[in-house]
Amino acid sequence: MLEIKNITKTFNKGTVNEKKALRGVNLTLNDGDFVTVIGGNGAGKSTLMNVISGSYEADTGKIFLDGKNITHLKEHQRARTIGRLFQDPLRGTAPNMTIEENLGLAYSRGKRRSLTIGIRKKDVSVFRERLKELDLGLEDRMKMPVGLLSGGQRQALTLLMATIVTPKLLLLDEHTAALDPKTAEKVMRITEKIVKENALTTLMITHNISNAIEYGNKTIVMSQGKLLLTIEGEQRANMTVEKLMKLYSDTAEDELSDKMILQE
């Protein structure tokens, strides 16, 4: 369970470039919630994820994960229980290491054992079975350097690495935005499968309005650093792209980008 209480974040405070990125954000994700996030440029979406992950420290407010106050924990400390994917497929993997070695690093997260001790045979079997679930043929290329994979393959692998040790929270920061539409759709299907099968509590920023209402069980709308709306239940079940766009335009202080509208 993730609880965010009255989080604020301001950049360049006291200067002409002051930017209030988060303005008293309150948000609760119950165990197993899959929440999608939409908003225009500068809405505070990525800043919110950076504050949750520990990349940025909030100015005020508190963050609790499974009842533990993580507000002042460093990013590497939170990484033991929080998985994260970024927009860039090149982030999150070591390109000169093999698929097997990358998975070995991910599998040792939070454990004392390191890769230098070697990857155990039973771990390799686990990796192979998990790779099969991606349906990309990567289980037959475990000795291949990750740098030789396509963007979609690499992002799918990164997703597996982020979840091979079940995290308490999964953060997806526009993780399909850099992929072509067909590949993005495949990665989203893989994402949905992994999230559902592991009942992962997930927060996903998306640039795709259709994805915002197709995946997950809740959608939140952000604008100008504030959480404006939470759409769930019957309202979300009956939501369409057109209705969501109108709802956004009626309540938000900014506009959705053309890219988001075209992605519908």
Residue ranges and their predicted role:
Residues M1, T10-G24, K74:
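A short, flexible loop at the N-terminus of ABC-type nucleotide-binding domains that lies
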